[in-house]
Amino acid sequence: MISISFLNCFFLVFLFLFFSDVHGSYNGLGLKPQMGWNSWNKYACDIDESIILNNAKAIKEEGLLDLGYEYIVMDDCWSKHERNATTGRLEANPDKFPNGIGSMAKKLHDMGFKFGMYSSAGKYTCAGFPGSLNHEQIDADTFADWGVDYLKYDNCFNEGKSGVPLISYERYKRMSDALNKTGRPIFYSLCQWGEDFVWNWGNTIANSWRISGDIFDTFSRKDVRCPCETIECFALQGDHCSVMNIISKASFLSSKAGMNSGWNDLDSLEVGNGGMSFEEYKTHFTMWAILKSPLILGNDVSSMSPMDKLIVSNKELISINQDIGTNPAALIWKKKYGDEYIELFSGRLSNNDWVVAVLNAASEPLKMGIHLSDIFVDALGNAEHDWLATDLWNNNVKLVSDRIRANVASHGVQVWRFQQYKVKNTNDKFFSFNKH
């Protein structure tokens, strides 16, 4: 009998050989991570046309559309519980969407947005509404007729068609092919929860792919409903996953994303939903930005506080997230401190700039000194230069010749944009940190 591990390995080798010469997005979309808003984190099933349009209106009035938040994505619970008995098509719940989905899509388009829909690659959606498994083409045609620009495609009630990468790939490819046959450009966002090594094959059929179970509005609290701590646990991702849990999984996947493939999706943002502190939300947004996750708001934008708006409006971090042609920042090291970790990330940007971030997951503030030889471990020639480092939260600029010093709050992050200044003489370099 052929083992599951053998099938997994065979399929991964097949993908590498078959797609090694593929360049660019599979459908020409998603050359940078998508930005927008999704209804699920805040509203779950409690959605209707007014909620969707009011959030879109607030996004535009707050200037967030101008910053790139262009997709308005309606999540689960929008449809009737049964398909149309005559046509077989999905239909909107008339109590929630009395004017129909196409009418709402037109209103969003007229406001300058792109419109996103939700379905599942299963018999039912996660909330028990009709799914698209075995109905891919008729549903894709319906979405295209409604003017849909984006599809979030979930993984619930998949009838056991998972557990082996090839099986999951084929199930999700059916909708990919169906969307492409419509002739309408539709961004394809897999919500496959990181199962079956989706980061190894998602880029061949989609524009982004989830790498974890559902996010929960907490920084680092462990939850038995999110049993996986690392990406190796690929078959039981669960939900109620903390920000740090998801960062831990994403940290090892920087090579799997980019303009020539697609994007690791760390799930929608929780900023503004009230479960974390200001410092923790800053860390949440910073790490999503530099890891080049999609930046999808998940709050009630119409009641967003000035501090929450400050976080999601950080133009410098958004520009790094949207920097075309660059890959996610990479985890350089992860050092134990107490029960938690201190982590260093760096990544190349356009014009030979770099993004550098130090994350302090510990329960106390720390003073740190990070040396250039650590930051540029993959490009040591850069350690021979002086650098101008701009703090991307307070805009302070400092000259860095040997190491950069930082006071990092508990559950906080310090993030800089490094710009080359001049060549210098080298000194001995080391890493150190001390209690604040």
UniProtKB/Swiss-Prot annotation:
Q: Where does the record locate the signal sequence feature?
A: 1-24
Which keywords fit this entry according to its UniProt record? Disulfide bond, Endoplasmic reticulum, Glycoprotein, Glycosidase, Hydrolase, Secreted, Signal
Q: Pfam families attached here? A: Melibiase_2 (PF16499), Melibiase_C (PF17801)
Q: Which residues are glycosylated?
A: N84, N180
- Enumerate the CDD domains for this protein: GH27
SUPFAM superfamilies this protein is in? (Trans)glycosidases, Glycosyl hydrolase domain
Subcellular location per UniProt equals: Endoplasmic reticulum lumen; Secreted
| Record-level GO cellular component terms | endoplasmic reticulum lumen; extracellular region
Major location category of this protein? endoplasmic reticulum
Q: List the disulfide bonds.
A: C45-C77, C126-C156
Q: What is its EC number?
A: 3.2.1.22
- What is the catalytic activity of this protein? Hydrolysis of terminal, non-reducing alpha-D-galactose residues in alpha-D-galactosides, including galactose oligosaccharides, galactomannans and galactolipids
Keyword ATP-binding appears in the UniProt entry: no
Per the record, the GO terms for biological process are: melibiose catabolic process
Residues annotated as the enzyme's active site: D154 (nucleophile), D214 (proton donor)
Gene Ontology molecular-function annotations: alpha-galactosidase activity
Similarity annotation: Belongs to the glycosyl hydrolase 27 family.
User: What's this chain's function?
Assistant: Secreted alpha-galactosidase required for catabolic conversion of melibiose to glucose and galactose.
Q: Per its record, how is this protein called by name?
A: Alpha-galactosidase mel1
The primary gene name is mel1
